[in-house]
Amino acid sequence: MILNSSTEDGIKRIQDDCPKAGRHNYIFVMIPTLYSIIFVVGIFGNSLVVIVIYFYMKLKTVASVFLLNLALADLCFLLTLPLWAVYTAMEYRWPFGNYLCKIASASVSFNLYASVFLLTCLSIDRYVAIVHPMKSPVRRTMLMAKVTCIIIWLLAGLASLPTIIHRNVFFIENTNITVCAFHYESQNSTLPIGLGLTKNILGFLFPFLIILTSYTLIWKTLKRAYEIQKNKPRNDDIFKIIMAIVLFFFFSWVPHQIFTFLDVLIQLGIIHDCKIADIVDTAMPITICIAYFNNCLNPLFYGFLGKKFKKYFLQLLKYIPPKAKSHSSLSTKMSTLSYRPSDHGNASTKKSASCVEVE
């Protein structure tokens, strides 16, 4: 992911056509302030999530493995955020050298893909647990979860390779600044366009469709369960949680993805207007703040859907140490729903809807 489109994907545009795109005094004040807030809140929140899941919950469930990795991925990104805050406050002047430029840039890209992939796997895990509970013990194992996380980290690293290779520190003559930006040997390189479209498709569109499909099927399964168990009161909170999960992901990322796509159109020469380029480059860091602030809250958001997570989180805040006895799972807000569609079939079918949150 890119923290400032005006100094990287749009580098050719800055040098030639629109040198002042995205360069406003209020941006140089507001964005570093927002980055600082995200850094403090994110480091504090995600560190507590890691402590609660690993030391209090004892990392006993598939969902907890995904949440732990989600928090760790966020922490890796957050550690580089002060660099970007200083970079923006200095009006996009990079004082930290080439190695930190590559490392910090790769961390941003890595976090985008790792977080989105982990959230997608978490939705698939919920789908298997609720829609196919009989197959769940076979498919949802701790080993499978850990292997999946390793694969996700490798894929995120692979997706970040272009950033490591092409992101460098160099001097822009007409603006007289040293930037940390994508630098291509040829100004006609199609790589920035490819990276932008990859971010749109692989970093948002496909994962969102999977998440939407998973929770839609979960919704239908739970609704059918409630219809069969008419004697039990319906808990609408479950459906509100499902809606919140899907909408939270969508509205966190769609603004940034829209402006990333507009930036691709500018790269392709479809959009020529410098006013539009200025709007895109000005809005880009703002949409990034929205995406990454929500992204860093994801572990807390998903974790707090479980009752035991909330219990242990409060214990940690009160300096109550974890008990020696391990806890088998994150408790759920949703009670188990069991029903038999027919008493006259070849075999009784039993389904259990486990938690939408974390199990």
From Swiss-Prot:
Keywords: Cell membrane, Disulfide bond, G-protein coupled receptor, Glycoprotein, Lipoprotein, Membrane, Palmitate, Phosphoprotein, Receptor, Transducer, Transmembrane, Transmembrane helix. Its main location: membrane. It is a multi-pass membrane protein. C-terminal Ser or Thr residues may be phosphorylated. Residues 335-359 are annotated as: Disordered. Glycans are attached at N4, N176, N188. Adrenal, liver, aorta, kidney, lung, testis and heart. The chain crosses the membrane at residues 26-55, 62-89, 99-125, 142-165, 191-216, 240-268, 279-304. SUPFAM superfamilies: Family A G protein-coupled receptor-like (SSF81321). A lipid is attached at C355 (S-palmitoyl cysteine). The keyword Transmembrane helix applies. Residues 56-61, 126-141, 217-239, 305-359 are cytoplasmic. It is found in: Cell membrane. One of its GO terms (molecular function) is angiotensin type II receptor activity. Angiotensin II binds at Q15, D17, R167, F182, H183, Y184, K199. Gene3D superfamilies: Rhodopsin 7-helix transmembrane proteins (1.20.1070.10). GO terms for biological process: G protein-coupled receptor signaling pathway; inflammatory response; maintenance of blood vessel diameter homeostasis by renin-angiotensin; positive regulation of cytosolic calcium ion concentration; regulation of vasoconstriction. It holds the Pfam family 7tm_1. Residues 1-25, 90-98, 166-190, 269-278 are extracellular. SMART domains: 7TM_GPCR_Srsx. Disulfide bonds join C18-C274, C101-C180. The keyword Lipoprotein applies. Belongs to the G-protein coupled receptor 1 family. Receptor for angiotensin II, a vasoconstricting peptide, which acts as a key regulator of blood pressure and sodium retention by the kidney. The activated receptor in turn couples to G-alpha proteins G(q) (GNAQ, GNA11, GNA14 or GNA15) and thus activates phospholipase C and increases the cytosolic Ca(2+) concentrations, which in turn triggers cellular responses such as stimulation of protein kinase C. Interacts with MAS1. Interacts with ARRB1. Interacts with FLNA (via filamin repeat 21); increases PKA-mediated phosphorylation of FLNA. This is Type-1 angiotensin II receptor. The gene is AGTR1.
